[in-house]
Swiss-Prot record:
Cellular compartments annotated: Cytoplasm
HAMAP family in UniProt: RNA_methyltr_RlmN
Protein name: Probable dual-specificity RNA methyltransferase RlmN
Residues of the active site: 90, 331
Source organism per UniProt: Clostridium botulinum (strain Alaska E43 / Type E3)
Function recorded in the entry: Specifically methylates position 2 of adenine 2503 in 23S rRNA and position 2 of adenine 37 in tRNAs.
Pfam families per record: Radical_SAM, RlmN_N
Disulfide bonds: 103-331
Lineage of origin: Bacteria, Bacillati, Bacillota, Clostridia, Eubacteriales
Cofactor: [4Fe-4S] cluster
Length: 347
C-alpha cells in the first residue's frame, strides 16, 4: 500500500491518467488531504468508484505522537513520532510573535558523523520518504490547531543525503495545492555535500541555504566533521557563491562554538577574513552538550567577543536564541534518551 503523501500533484495526475480517471481529480484529492481529511471516503466530491480505487491502492499514513515535551522556559514543544515500522524521529515546534516555526527531520539517524551532534551517534538507519517529512508538519498543525508558517530542515539527518525525497518535499510544502508555505520561509541546513549544493542552486528556489561550517580551516574542520575529508572549505565556498549567483539569496553559515576548540579570537578573525565580501550571515550557536561527547560550550563572554569581532569585520552575525534547553531540544537528543529508557525498562 502506497502512502499518497509521497506523491506530488504531477505524480498523482499521472496515476489518474494511467487508471482511466480524470486528471483534475488529482488536485481535488490534494486539496482534501491538505485540509486534514484523513479518509478517502470523506472526500465528498469524489465518485464512489474512484474512492474504491484509492482505498485499494493508497493509504494516508501519518506517524503516531509517542511523546510530547513542553519547555517551561519558552513554550517550545518537542514531538517524538513513531512510524508504522517502529522507527522514531523528532520535531521541534517553536512559537514566535511572527508565527509558528517547526524544525523537522529528514532521516532516521545520520551518517555524516559530526562530533557535536547526537543524531549521528548510531549512524543512519534509513531515509524518510517525502510523505514522512511532510507528515511532521501535518501532525503538529493538527495537534495545535494553528498554521505552521516557517520550516527549518535542521532536525535529525542530512537533507542533501536524502536529496530526491527532500526536493519533492520542498515542492509540495510550498505549492498552492500543498501546504502553501512560502519558500522564503524555509531553511535547509547541510554539512556541505558540494555536488548537491550545485544541483540545488540550479533549481533556483527561494529557500535559505544554511551551511554547517563550524571552523575556518580544513584542518580544524576535519577534527569535528568527517565530511571535511571529502570536501574542502574552498569547494564549499565556491558552491555557495554559485548558489548566491543563481538564486540571489543570502547564505547562512552556522558556527557551533565549542570551548577551546574553535572559539578563540584568532578563530573569529580568521572566519571573518574567510567570509568577507560574501552575501552571507553567520549564526553563532552555543554547542549543545551531549553525554557521549566531551565538548563543552563556550562562555557567554567568549561568544559575545566572537560575535563582536565578526561584526567589526563587516560580517552580519547573530547568536542563536536558545529554545527548549530544558527539554533537550537539540536534534537527536530526545530520540536517543527515549530509546535508552525503553531498553532499561525492557520494553
Amino acid at each position: 500500500m502506497k502512502n499518497i503523501l509521497d506523491y506530488t500533484l504531477e505524480e498523482l495526475t499521472l496515476w489518474m491518467k494511467e487508471n482511466n480517471e480524470s486528471s483534475f481529480r488529482a488536485k481535488q484529492i490534494m486539496s482534501w488531504i491538505y485540509k486534514d481529511v484523513r479518509n478517502f471516503s470523506d472526500m465528498r466530491n469524489m465518485p464512489k468508484s474512484l474512492i474504491a480505487k484509492l482505498e485499494e491502492n493508497f493509504e494516508i499514513s501519518l506517524p503516531e505522537i509517542e511523546e510530547i515535551y513542553k519547555s517551561e522556559l519558552d513554550g517550545t514543544e518537542k514531538f517524538l513520532f513513531k512510524f508504522s515500522d517502529g522507527n522514531l524521529i523528532e520535531s521541534v515546534l517553536m512559537r514566535y510573535k511572527h508565527g509558528n516555526s517547526i524544525c523537522i527531520s529528514t532521516q532516521i539517524g545520520c551518517r555524516m558523523g559530526c562530533k557535536f551532534c547526537a543524531s549521528t551517534i548510531d549512524g543512519r538507519i534509513r531515509n524518510l520518504t517525502t510523505g514522512e517529512i511532510l507528515s511532521q508538519i501535518l501532525v503538529v498543525q493538527n495537534y495545535i490547531g494553528e498554521r505552521i508558517s516557517n520550516v527549518v530542515l535542521m532536525g535529525s539527518g542530512e537533507p542533501l543525503d536524502n536529496y530526491e525525497n527532500v526536493m519533492k518535499f520542498l515542492e509540495v510544502v510550498s505549492a498552492e495545492y500543498g501546504l502553501n508555505i512560502g519558500q522564503r520561509h524555509i531553511t535547509l541546513s547541510t554539512c556541505g555535500i558540494v555536488p548537491k549544493i550545485y544541483e540545488l542552486a540550479d533549481k533556483e528556489l527561494s529557500i535559505t541555504l544554511a551551511i554547517s561550517l563550524h571552523a575556518f580551516s580544513d584542518e580544524k574542520r576535519k577534527e569535528i566533521m568527517p565530511i571535511a575529508n571529502k570536501y574542502s572549505i574552498d569547494e564549499i565556498l565556491n558552491a555557495c557563491k554559485y548558489f548566491i549567483n543563481k538564486t540571489k539569496r543570502r547564505i547562512t553559515f552556522e558556527y557551533s562554538l565549542v570551548k577551546d576548540v574553535n572559539d578563540s579570537k584568532e578563530d573569529a578573525r580568521a572566519l571573518g577574513k574567510l567570509l568577507k565580501g560574501m552575501l552571507c550571515h553567520v549564526n553563532l550557536i552555543p554547542v549543545n552538550e551531549i553525554k557521549e561527547r566531551t565538548f563543552k560550550r563556550s562562555s557567554k563572554e567568549t561568544i559575545q567577543d566572537f560575535a563582536n569581532i565578526l561584526s567589526n569585520l563587516g560580517i552580519e552575525v547573530t547568536v542563536r536564541r536558545e529554545m527548549g534547553s530544558d527539554i533537550n531540544a537539540a536534534c537527536g537528543q530526545l530520540r536517543r534518551s527515549y530509546i535508552k529508557t525503553q531498553e532499561t525498562r525492557g520494553e
